[in-house]
């Protein structure tokens, strides 16, 4: 008993804890291993280099892991990752445990040991590594290292070669240095050591190694050498005697020169000075030389140091622009980008603290020019007043940023004290703190961004040095401005920002420790009016831009400052209303600088620039040649931009250029010529009643004095464009117009980016563009046309060129090409086109390859139009006759072929009627009516194609698949396909696109009246018309061949016909089927190239007469149709009695022979000479057939028996029992 009790007791304790053990085991399996002490495996890695491993490495990784490592680098870098160790559970397709690598372009999965020792690069500046494990089998995992690799030159400096035979750092061969009469040159440099020796930082020389431009240091001091003139710069450099301008940290130096001033501008350490150098007046630096960094002479060494961000412009910048020059202003001659340089790898060194490097998220691109002067064209940099302590400022990126800083944002001043334990250089401390601030506020719940970060100096310090504590511990005081955009009205207290920074203290770089943090919100400047008429609202410290009250398009500005020692104290700075007082010439010159070569203008920039120029033009009553030249150069620079960027502002730009030409001052001269690189303008005075100007031409100059040469007299030998005005140009002008006619304006466009047709039918512009206008009036419908001769942009054969003018009102005022009133003259050739136009505007030559109807000459167009209208009229009449015949006589429409023929005739009838009415309806200029006609024409064209295809399908069923074929509701299904399919296609087109883009007026000739309501979109045309017909056409060809094989096979068995009779019968069958199945529409496929015109004639003749041929072969020549006509329409001896032999023959279903089948095979093809027989006998009944009048002929018929099976019967000399036929 005791034993039992013990056993029972023992068993009791054995099973009692089992539920707990089960839960514990489940917990072990399900809880991620990081709970037991392994590191977190969902992190973002943004350090320049480092390592990461699988959880618990080098021990086995836990079960059920889902890890993600996001590796990020700044713009301009990629990430390279290397797997030093790799051991993950192996399985097919890595279905259990796996590591997935996403490089930005593709995703790759690894398992087993496949990735060990391999390296992978990201496609951009971010890479994702994910790792997952299942519930069983653990392995060692992986160990990976990563590093940033610089791919942008902005992140790399150049180590200058110290010997001429070491290597050369030069501008790439693809970059051509232009001839320079002025330049601005900026670069940053460092110098190693304190040797007082001569050196050269850069040199520019010709092919014979003659120095053309160089900068360096000689015994006499720092110099800039231009050609053979050496200009000393010591007086402009704020350095002591024998002190190097460059030290161990980078300093930027900018040099400015203009050959008309005789002085050198030097901008160094935010100080701009000029030094005289009269020997450089009128000198020009030749182009196509070789630019090197360092020295190209053996006797002079290169600067012993590094160079960075070397940029060169072929124009001058003033002190204000240079003081605000940002990293994103690209040099238009040479820029610090890989494409501009040929640099050996050993000369490059990547660093993360370069001034224009992208070690953080980059700021928006700054604009070149004074923002206060240019209004909305760019955003000014906020400058601190002179009363504030000096700062060293670093631009900071935006964290969770929006596109522009908002004035309603809340601004905080963050003051941090950093302990510099390892005594890092101040530049490095600044960089590390910047990274730390960026990472701290990245992906925060509040939308904030840091404006800048700076070292703060207390009063009395003359250098940027550290503050030292009592323990002589080096500390740095840094200030940063943080902007909070309270988009959701959520309050952000300063202590929350402070706690966020303190919490992230550990992420600071080694050797740096956060000592204290202080966050204070900045105050507001009060609203006020100063001076009168200028109202400044209450804002936080920032710049506020106010439109000039009496000068639309220009603006005044004022800055709200905060007190450095007490951020709650704010005050307004002085009002800058200089822009409101500027003359148009000064503003135009500033805009010209903004558009100078090399500037990367966006579409928004161009739109703003055009708007500014438009305001200048509208304001000025008379524009002198100086201002006009500046404005034309602005437009010329704009034309160098991409076509996509020009599209939005093209219409306004063209209107402004026209207005500019009209306002050019001619009081002191009879004509004005302005030439630029991409644009030329010529304006000449003109008196009514005279022929002072009979022609104008523009061509390339005989020398290099200007871009183009313009001539109003004899013309040039081979001009790019010329205009010949008719002698009666100014006749019959009204008195009002005569007053306005005082000038003629001609504008030539070398670049055609402003002429982009966004309409659905986009033709290709193959010539330059020439604009002509007389005063400010509209002249059209000239008795004698204006002759415009325009060169093609490329010498090539342009088949059927189209002369067109630019219609500013087309395409919802975006503009588009219009051919009305212009035709191409026969004197045109491969290199140029001669256009004759009856009005004035912007003229160009287009090429429209696929649809060439509008490219025919006037004679062929008239002939083809005449043939089409006459043919369609005849076709409509006889299609109506065919349809009326079958509708009127009930006996004719009992069989299926007759019903199919009726539907085909209906589609043809409406197609021809709509075609005849289309041109007349177009003349009403009612868009809705034109679209409706085009839609109906499209529908009935597709319906015609469809019913021709159904004819072919029916013949195949009747002649080839003759046994055991039964289709319920045969005609109903054909009607659904015949009318429903075209309706579906047209409905889809109408639903998927704007009706105005698909259907509308289309020009199909060169005369003004050659317009047609039809499909405008070429894609819709080729898919729904050409493609649709192509399918039906090839189907009909296949059916045509099959049917003809059947006919010829049966007719070939007859022995009582001569060869001539056999050929004629087969030929008649071919002709009747050709028109019935629409085979003549296939001529369209051959209307290309030299055979274009002949096949267009064949196409027009046969297809416009299709209704006539169908009437002849499938109505008039049918015996049962003739019988009905004679019975009901004829009188006297021509009338046929109802009980005639002919009638009996047909009524008793005595069929003609297969040659008669061929004779009238058709839509009424099968059994066409009699009605179809629907047998009333049972399937077991016997049917006998009567002998035909031709005893040797075999008659052929199809009929449907009661059960619905299609039957085939033969009639011969002997009565044959065929069964249930």
Swiss-Prot record:
Disulfide bond positions: 41-67, 94-111, 186-254, 231-277, 525-560, 548-580, 803-835, 822-837
Outcome following mutation: residue 1099 to A: Strongly decreased G-protein coupled receptor activity in response to 17alpha-hydroxyprogesterone (17OHP)
CDD domains cross-referenced by the UniProt entry: 7tmB2_GPR126 (cd15996), CUB (cd00041)
Expressing tissues: Expressed in placenta and to a lower extent in pancreas and liver. Detected in aortic endothelial cells but not in skin microvascular endothelial cells.
GO cellular component: cell surface; cytoplasm; endoplasmic reticulum membrane; membrane; plasma membrane
GO BP term, example: adenylate cyclase-modulating G protein-coupled receptor signaling pathway
Pfam families in the cross-refs: 7tm_2, CUB, GPS, Pentaxin, SEA_Gpr126
Recorded family membership: Belongs to the G-protein coupled receptor 2 family. Adhesion G-protein coupled receptor (ADGR) subfamily.
UniProt name for this protein: Adhesion G-protein coupled receptor G6
Regulation: Forms a heterodimer of 2 chains generated by proteolytic processing that remain associated through non-covalent interactions mediated by the GAIN-B domain. In the inactivated receptor, the Stachel sequence (also named stalk) is embedded in the GAIN-B domain, where it adopts a beta-strand conformation. On activation, the Stachel moves into the 7 transmembrane region and adopts a twisted hook-shaped configuration that forms contacts within the receptor, leading to coupling of a G-alpha protein, which activates signaling.
Region (GPS): 803-853
Induction of the gene: Up-regulated by bacterial lipopolysaccharides (LPS) and thrombin, but not by other inflammatory stimuli in primary umbilical veins.
Region annotated Disordered, chain positions: 1156-1176
Gene giving rise to this polypeptide: ADGRG6
Effect recorded for residue 1057 to Q: Found in patients with aggressive periodontitis; impairs cAMP production; abrogates osteoblastic differentiation
Assembly description: Heterodimer of 2 chains generated by proteolytic processing; the large extracellular N-terminal fragment and the membrane-bound C-terminal fragment predominantly remain associated and non-covalently linked. Interacts with Laminin-2; this interaction stabilizes the receptor in an inactive state. Laminin-2 polymerization could facilitate ADGRG6-NTF removal, thereby exposing the tethered agonist to drive myelination. Interacts with PRNP. Interacts with ITGB1. Interacts with LRP1.
């Amino acid at each position: 008993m005791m034993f039992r009790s013990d056993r029972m007791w023992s068993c009791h304790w054995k099973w009692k804890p089992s539920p707990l053990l089960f839960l514990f085991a489940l917990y072990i399996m399900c809880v991620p291993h990081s709970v037991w002490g392994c590191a977190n495996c969902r992190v973002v890695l943004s350090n320049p280099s480092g390592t990461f491993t699988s959880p618990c490495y080098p021990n086995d990784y836990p079960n059920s892991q889902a890890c993600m490592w996001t590796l990020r680098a700044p713009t301009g870098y990629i990430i390279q990752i290397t797997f030093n160790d790799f051991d993950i559970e192996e399985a097919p397709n890595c279905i259990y445990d796996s590591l997935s690598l996403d490089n930005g372009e593709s995703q790759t999965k690894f398992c087993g040991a496949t990735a060990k020792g391999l390296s992978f690069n990201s496609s951009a500046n971010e890479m994702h590594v994910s790792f997952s494990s299942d519930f069983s089998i653990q392995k060692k995992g992986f160990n990976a290292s990563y590093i940033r690799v610089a791919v942008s030159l902005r992140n790399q400096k150049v180590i200058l070669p110290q010997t001429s035979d070491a290597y050369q750092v030069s501008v790439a061969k693809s970059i051509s240095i232009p001839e320079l009469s002025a330049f601005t040159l900026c670069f940053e440099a460092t110098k190693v050591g304190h040797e007082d020796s001569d050196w050269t930082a850069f040199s520019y020389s010709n092919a014979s190694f003659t120095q053309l431009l160089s900068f360096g240091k000689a015994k006499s001091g720092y110099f800039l050498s231009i050609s053979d003139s050496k200009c000393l710069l010591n007086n402009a450099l704020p350095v002591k005697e024998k002190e190097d301008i460059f030290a161990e940290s980078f300093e930027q130096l900018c040099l400015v020169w203009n050959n008309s001033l005789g002085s050198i501008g030097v901008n160094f350490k935010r100080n701009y000075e000029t030094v005289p150098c009269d020997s450089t007046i009128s000198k020009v630096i030749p182009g196509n030389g070789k630019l090197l960094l360092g020295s190209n002479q053996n006797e002079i060494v290169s600067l012993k140091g590094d160079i960075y961000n070397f940029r060169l412009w072929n124009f001058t910048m003033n002190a204000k622009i240079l003081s605000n020059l940002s990293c994103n202003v690209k040099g238009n001659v040479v820029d610090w980008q890989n494409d501009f340089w040929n640099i050996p790898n050993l000369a490059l060194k990547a660093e993360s603290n370069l001034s224009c490097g992208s070690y953080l998220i980059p700021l928006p691109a700054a604009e070149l020019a004074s923002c206060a002067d240019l209004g909305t064209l760019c955003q000014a940099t906020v400058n601190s007043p002179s009363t504030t302590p000096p700062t060293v400022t670093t631009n900071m990126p935006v964290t969770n940023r929006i596109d522009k800083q908002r004035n309603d944002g809340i601004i905080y001043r963050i003051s941090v004290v950093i302990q510099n334990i390892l005594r890092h250089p101040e530049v490095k401390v600044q960089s590390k703190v910047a990274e730390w601030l960026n990472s701290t506020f990245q992906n925060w719940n509040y939308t904030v961004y840091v404006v800048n970060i700076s070292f703060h100096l207390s009063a009395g310090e003359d250098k940027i040095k550290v503050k030292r504590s009592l323990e002589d511990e080096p500390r740095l005081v840094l200030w940063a401005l943080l902007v909070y955009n309270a988009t959701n009205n959520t309050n952000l207290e300063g202590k929350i920002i402070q706690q966020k920074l303190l919490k992230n203290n550990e992420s600071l770089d080694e050797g740096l420790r956060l000592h204290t943090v202080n966050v204070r919100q900045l105050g507001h400047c009060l609203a006020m009016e100063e001076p009168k008429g200028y109202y400044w609202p209450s804002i936080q410290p920032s710049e506020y831009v106010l439109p000039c009250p009496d000068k639309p398009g220009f603006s005044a500005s004022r800055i709200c400052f905060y007190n450095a020692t007490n951020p709650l104290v704010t005050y307004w700075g002085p009002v800058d209303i200089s822009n409101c007082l500027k003359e148009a010439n000064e503003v135009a010159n500033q805009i010209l600088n903004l558009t100078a070569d090399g500037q990367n203008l966006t579409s928004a920039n161009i739109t703003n620039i055009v708007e500014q120029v438009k305001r200048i033009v509208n304001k000025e009553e008379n524009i002198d040649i100086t201002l006009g030249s500046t404005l034309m150069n602005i437009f010329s620079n704009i034309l160098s931009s991409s076509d996509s960027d020009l599209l939005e502002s093209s219409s306004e730009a063209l209107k402004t250029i026209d207005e500019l030409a009209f306002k050019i001052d001619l009081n002191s001269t009879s004509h004005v010529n302005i030439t630029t690189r991409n644009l030329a303008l010529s304006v000449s005075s003109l008196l009514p009643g005279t022929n002072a100007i009979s022609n104008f031409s523009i061509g390339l100059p005989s020398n290099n004095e200007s871009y183009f040469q313009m001539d109003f007299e004899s013309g040039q030998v081979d001009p790019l464009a010329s205009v010949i005005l008719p002698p009666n140009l100014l006749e019959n002008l009204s008195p009002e117009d005569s007053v306005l006619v005082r000038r003629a304006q001609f504008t030539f466009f070398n670049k055609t980016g402003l002429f982009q047709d966004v309409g659905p039918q986009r033709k290709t512009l193959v010539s330059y563009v020439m604009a002509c206008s007389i005063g400010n009036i509209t002249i059209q419908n000239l008795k004698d046309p204006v002759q415009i001769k325009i060169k093609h942009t490329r010498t090539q054969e342009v088949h059927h060129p189209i002369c067109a003018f630019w219609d500013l009102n087309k395409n919802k005022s975006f503009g588009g090409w219009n051919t009305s009133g212009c035709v191409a003259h026969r004197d045109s050739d491969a290199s140029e086109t001669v256009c004759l136009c009856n009005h004035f505007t912007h003229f160009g030559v287009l090429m429209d390859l696929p649809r060439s109807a509008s490219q025919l000459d006037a004679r062929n167009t008239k002939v083809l139009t005449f043939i089409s209208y006459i043919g369609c009229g005849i076709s409509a009449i006889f299609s109506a006759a065919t349809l009326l015949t079958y509708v009127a006589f009930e006996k004719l429409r009992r069989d299926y072929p007759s019903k199919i023929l009726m539907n085909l005739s209906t589609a043809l009838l409406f197609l021809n009627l709509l075609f005849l009415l289309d041109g007349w309806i177009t003349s009403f200029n009612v868009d809705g009516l034109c679209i409706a006609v085009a839609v109906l024409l499209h529908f009935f064209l597709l319906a015609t194609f469809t019913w021709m295809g159904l004819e072919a399908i029916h013949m195949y069923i009747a002649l080839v698949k003759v046994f055991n074929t039964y289709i319920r509701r045969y005609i109903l299904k054909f009607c659904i396909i015949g009318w429903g399919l075209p309706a579906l296609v047209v409905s889809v087109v109408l639903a998927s696109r704007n009706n105005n883009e698909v259907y509308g007026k289309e020009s199909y000739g060169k005369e003004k009246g050659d317009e047609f309501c039809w499909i405008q979109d070429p894609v819709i045309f080729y898919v729904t018309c050409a493609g649709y017909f192509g399918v039906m056409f090839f189907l009909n060809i296949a059916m045509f061949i099959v049917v003809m094989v059947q006919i010829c096979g049966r007719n070939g068995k007859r022995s009582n016909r001569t060869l001539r009779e056999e050929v004629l019968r087969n030929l008649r069958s071919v002709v009747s089927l050709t028109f019935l199945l629409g085979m003549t529409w296939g001529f369209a496929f051959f209307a290309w190239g030299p055979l274009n015109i002949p096949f267009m004639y064949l196409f027009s003749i046969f297809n416009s007469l299709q209704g006539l041929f169908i009437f002849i072969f499938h109505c008039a020549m049918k015996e049962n149709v003739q019988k009905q006509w004679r019975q009901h329409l004829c009188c006297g001896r021509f009338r046929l009695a109802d009980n005639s032999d002919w009638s009996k023959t047909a009524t008793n279903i005595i069929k003609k022979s297969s040659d008669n089948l061929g004779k009238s095979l058709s839509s009424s093809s099968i059994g066409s000479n009699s009605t179809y027989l629907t047998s009333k006998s049972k399937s077991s009944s016997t049917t006998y057939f009567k002998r035909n009048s031709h005893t040797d002929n075999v008659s052929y018929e199809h009929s449907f028996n009661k059960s619905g099976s299609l039957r085939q019967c033969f009639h011969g000399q002997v009565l044959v029992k065929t069964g249930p036929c």
